[in-house]
């Protein structure tokens, strides 16, 4: 689509917070063109609005947290990935607590709800950040590189010193249907010993086998097992899409990540946005005889080769 989109109708989600263990409700509402994704902490006095942008990230410990004026919202990455994958550029997110509900540990419930709410085109062009030169950021043996590409593609190489995970690699060319079917159901995961330690420090109070894949020394603890044989790396790609969505534009490039997490994802997007010599910001304007919803093959943009 050449034009920005928003929700056609409101949609609400309720569930427990992964870390607080408290019941939380959030409501997505339509927003005007150029608004972006804005969270509203409606439980604070006065309410605080926080734009879902890279510059508002205040923590990347365990999840991605945005904050402003003393208020914060954590664990936003699954919702951000769902909004991005459904083509929603603008939305108000009313939330009555400090974190997005974890739901089943994946982005699938959000994708389903957003799809049911529907979307509509707005009168403003969507912006695309088209990578022209490679950009790399490293932290020890962790690394993220983005290369020029006609597509938005993510390749992820993950390593864990555990026989259940070991090394997993997957690459995906971003496509809404592929994300919905093959990546959005992938759940967050954790090692039981680490989860118990977090609980002892007042974190992960809402974690359970209902919203995460549990791993112990012997293997997968969940009775139902995994949703995909490589569910772990699929979830890492899901998280990355959500974190990268905080750039506020649609990325056109091939991201290659190795052992990265929320912290490096944030550093990467911050670095990329600062390197304006390595990309071009483009808008698509449809021909005058086309409607606002005319189809265009994006991010598979053959015209990029001429840029």
Swiss-Prot record:
Its cofactor is Zn(2+). SUPFAM superfamilies: Ribosomal protein S5 domain 2-like. It catalyses: a UDP-3-O-[(3R)-3-hydroxyacyl]-N-acetyl-alpha-D-glucosamine + H2O = a UDP-3-O-[(3R)-3-hydroxyacyl]-alpha-D-glucosamine + acetate. One of its GO terms (cellular component) is membrane. The active site is at 262 (proton donor). Pathway: Glycolipid biosynthesis; lipid IV(A) biosynthesis; lipid IV(A) from (3R)-3-hydroxytetradecanoyl-[acyl-carrier-protein] and UDP-N-acetyl-alpha-D-glucosamine: step 2/6. Catalyzes the hydrolysis of UDP-3-O-myristoyl-N-acetylglucosamine to form UDP-3-O-myristoylglucosamine and acetate, the committed step in lipid A biosynthesis. HAMAP family: LpxC. Belongs to the LpxC family. This is UDP-3-O-acyl-N-acetylglucosamine deacetylase. It comes from Geotalea uraniireducens (strain Rf4). The lineage of its organism: Bacteria, Pseudomonadati, Thermodesulfobacteriota, Desulfuromonadia, Geobacterales. The gene is lpxC.
């Amino acid at each position: 689509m050449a034009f920005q989109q928003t929700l056609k109708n409101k949609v609400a989600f309720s569930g427990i917070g992964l870390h607080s263990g408290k019941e939380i409700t959030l409501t997505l509402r339509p927003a005007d063109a150029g608004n972006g994704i804005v969270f509203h902490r409606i439980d604070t006095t006065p309410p605080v609005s926080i734009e879902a942008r890279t510059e508002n990230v205040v923590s990347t410990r365990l999840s991605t947290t945005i904050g402003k004026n003393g208020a914060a919202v954590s664990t936003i990455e699954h919702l951000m990935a769902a909004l991005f994958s459904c083509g929603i550029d603008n939305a108000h997110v009313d939330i009555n607590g400090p974190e997005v509900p974890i739901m089943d540990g994946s982005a699938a419930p959000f994708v389903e709800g957003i799809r049911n709410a529907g979307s509509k085109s707005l009168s403003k062009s969507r912006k695309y950040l088209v990578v022209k030169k490679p950009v790399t950021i490293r932290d020890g043996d962790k690394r993220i590189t983005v290369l020029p590409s006609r597509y938005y593609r993510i390749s992820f190489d993950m390593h864990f010193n555990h026989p259940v995970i070991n090394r997993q690699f997957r690459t995906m060319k971003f496509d809404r249907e592929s994300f919905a079917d093959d990546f959005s159901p992938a759940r967050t995961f954790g090692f039981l010993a680490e989860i118990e330690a977090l609980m002892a420090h007042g974190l992960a109070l809402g974690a359970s086998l209902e919203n995460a894949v549990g791993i112990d020394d012997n293997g997968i603890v969940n009775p139902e097992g995994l949703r995909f044989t490589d569910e772990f790396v699929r979830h890492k790609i899901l998280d990355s899409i959500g974190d990268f969505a905080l750039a506020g534009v649609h990325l056109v490039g091939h991201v290659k990540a190795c052992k990265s997490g929320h912290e490096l994802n944030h550093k990467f997007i911050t670095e990329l946005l600062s390197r304006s010599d390595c990309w071009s910001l483009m808008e698509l304007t449809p021909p005058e005889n086309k409607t606002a919803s005319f189809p265009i093959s994006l991010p598979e943009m053959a015209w990029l080769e001429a840029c």
